[in-house]
Amino acid sequence: MNVLLDTSIFLGKFLYYFLESLYYKIIPKKKKDVTGEIVLITGAASGLGRLLAIKFASLGAILVLWDINEEGNMETCRIIKEERDAKVFAYTCDCSNRQDVYRVADQVKKEVGNVTILINNAGVVTGREFLKTPDHMVERSFLVNVMSHFWTYKAFLPAMLEANHGHLVCISSFAGIVGINELSDYCASKFAAYGFAESLHFELKLLQKSKINTTIVCPYFIKTGMFEGCSTKYPLLLPMLTQEYAAQSILNAILEEQLYLIMPRFSHVALFLKQIISTNMMMTMAEYLGMDISLASFIEREKSGEVQTKTEGKQQ
């Protein structure tokens, strides 16, 4: 093909997809039916993971719950079974341990079936200055926040590829696209999770596996135990997200097969400005929004010696 023909094809496709995206901005996509889909959620013992499990159960999905917290995971299972007649399977799994992930994954495939919607939600946060963060906490952040994604994909993607059917969901973070002070290990691991999921999305499309979808979620701080005590200076501009709002938004994005979900909407503005304004301007904006002090109370509890599950590596 010559350059002129290639360019004409490119412009035609580009215009088509541009108009398509505008259309879906006005008229949302029809939500897909997840009845009978096998949905695996990591970090299902509490918070966002629990809410997502409850919402998927209400849509007729078969739930597979993973968490290192056996008691909390069984509580999620009990809540779902009490509220509705749903198929729910709970497994204790340490997502930071590759062998444990593969072992429990094999168990799931034998006892439940092939996972068709995988939601990598488990996460940990330290919330300390870089030089005050112990090495084992840095390693833990990467093992849970991103390496577990590699292992769950390895375990469940082959069956999706064979059937050309599935959905991969990465719960990254706003801290996975914008650096935030005193979250160096968390930001790095969430940047990695975002990049991994995006890379795999394009790899699958080039393999012509168009029926395997990806959704990458980048929320600002959610009001869960993981970020308890964090605050925001101007809630109207950059609010702490409620668990209900975050869970419903994520569910809608999955059902509409949306690739990116960034919350709240103002985050889009911050991300755009990051590309065009100077570093000093970025710092000024961060100070104005209070992002430089948003972890103050979180850090203070750390310094006071209070035991926090979020720094002890508990998956949430």
UniProtKB/Swiss-Prot annotation:
Binding positions (substrate): S173
Record InterPro entries: NAD(P)-bd_dom_sf (IPR036291), Sc_DH/Rdtase_CS (IPR020904), SDR_fam (IPR002347)
Keywords: NAD, NADP, Oxidoreductase
GO molecular function: oxidoreductase activity, acting on the CH-OH group of donors, NAD or NADP as acceptor
Positions bound to NAD(+): 40-64
Active site: Y186
Signal sequence interval, chain numbering: none
Top-rank taxon: Eukaryota
Class in the EC hierarchy, top level: oxidoreductase
A Pfam family the protein falls into: adh_short
UniProt-listed Enzyme Commission number(s): 1.1.1.-
GO CC annotation, single: lipid droplet
Record-stated family: Belongs to the short-chain dehydrogenases/reductases (SDR) family.
Protein name: Short-chain dehydrogenase/reductase family 16C member 6
Annotated organism of origin: Bos taurus
Gene this protein is translated from: SDR16C6
